[in-house]
């Protein structure tokens, strides 16, 4: 797709909502992960724990054009310094700790008989016979799980899930019928 876009003068954008996780899990520098894209957006709330926000990275021209479109769509905000400060803090202090989320996800994976080696970041996909019953059973015991389809569930660890929380959730999940 990138080659086609380049041939036709089309800019290529990377939705980097989980780019921080990919960076920490793979050890690949962010610059390398974003190579070949004209713009990249990175989320400051998913994983990093900022209250809101994303950052758009690109050339001055691309970012200026994005600001124009943001204004046209009425998406501008005023007095956002405190939110910017929270985002800056998250980038400075929460990127490296994403490895903890990844380790917690592997704990959940093991409880569900999912090979932990297949869990690269903070998201676990598992196959269960009755996802609706599984989700309900987990919820009754204080563990939130998302149904993905007729035989699949998804679990996500994050800044607010400690190693102790993951261990407790793993006990709950392991006891549920799958």
Predicted ranges, named:
Residues 1-128, 132-141, 145-161, 165-177:
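Conserved PLP-enzyme active-site core in the AAT-like
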């Amino acid at each position: 797709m990138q080659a086609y876009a380049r041939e036709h003068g089309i800019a290529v954008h990377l939705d980097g909502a989980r780019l921080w996780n990919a960076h920490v899990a793979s050890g690949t520098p962010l610059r390398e992960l974003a190579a070949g894209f004209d713009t990249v957006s990175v989320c400051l709330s998913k994983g990093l724990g900022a209250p809101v926000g994303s950052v758009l990275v690109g050339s001055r021209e691309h970012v200026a054009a994005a600001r124009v479109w943001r204004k046209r769509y009425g998406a501008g905000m005023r007095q956002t310094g405190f939110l910017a400060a929270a985002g800056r803090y998250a980038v400075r202090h929460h990127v490296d700790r994403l490895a903890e989320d990844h380790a917690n996800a592997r704990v959940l994976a093991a409880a569900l008989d999912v090979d932990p080696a297949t869990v690269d970041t903070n998201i676990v996909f598992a196959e269960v016979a009755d996802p609706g019953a599984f989700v309900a059973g987990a919820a009754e015991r204080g563990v939130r799980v998302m149904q993905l389809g007729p035989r699949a569930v998804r679990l996500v660890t994050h800044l607010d899930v400690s190693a102790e929380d993951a261990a407790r959730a793993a006990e709950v999940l392991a006891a549920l019928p799958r």
